[in-house]
Amino acid sequence: MAAKPEWVEQSPEEIEELIVKLHKEGQSTSQIGITLRDQHGIPNTKAVLGEKITDILKRNGTDFEYPEDLLNLIKRAVNIREHLEENPKDIHTKRGLIKIESKIRRLVKYYTRNNVLPEGWRYDPKTAALLVK
């Protein structure tokens, strides 16, 4: 674990309160990390607090149903499918959709293997739009 940078003036308790406050304002974990880095001069929460932002939020009562990276990929796939409904001959975007859905399936396989997702969970493009909205 890296040492706490000397320019970080906030105490670990203040940083933790800030993380919870930013999450209650609707920011995702990656947005919280960017805000801490850019506006508060905290380069890495794991170096300062010894745990990740998601672990801090789970400890403070926030439970994530799905991992953020998986949800972001599903949102992209849903948006591309909507685009392809209007532009069915866009073959380059079809290729992009195939690649994104391949990433989704690989992530689902990884998360089911590590017990983050339930054993029988499958990605279904028809229900994906309901999942992200």
UniProtKB/Swiss-Prot annotation:
Gene3D superfamilies the UniProt entry points to: 4.10.860.130, S15/NS1, RNA-binding (1.10.287.10)
GO BP annotation list: translation
This protein's GO CC annotations: cytosolic small ribosomal subunit
Source species, domain of life: Archaea
One Pfam family this sequence matches: Ribosomal_S13_N
SUPFAM superfamilies: S15/NS1 RNA-binding domain (SSF47060)
GO terms, molecular function: small ribosomal subunit rRNA binding; structural constituent of ribosome
Matching CDD domains: Ribosomal_S15p_S13e (cd00353)
Transmembrane parts of this sequence: none
Listed PROSITE patterns: RIBOSOMAL_S15
Keyword terms, alphabetized: Ribonucleoprotein, Ribosomal protein
Family: Belongs to the universal ribosomal protein uS15 family.
Subunit annotation: Part of the 30S ribosomal subunit.
Stated name of the protein: Small ribosomal subunit protein uS15
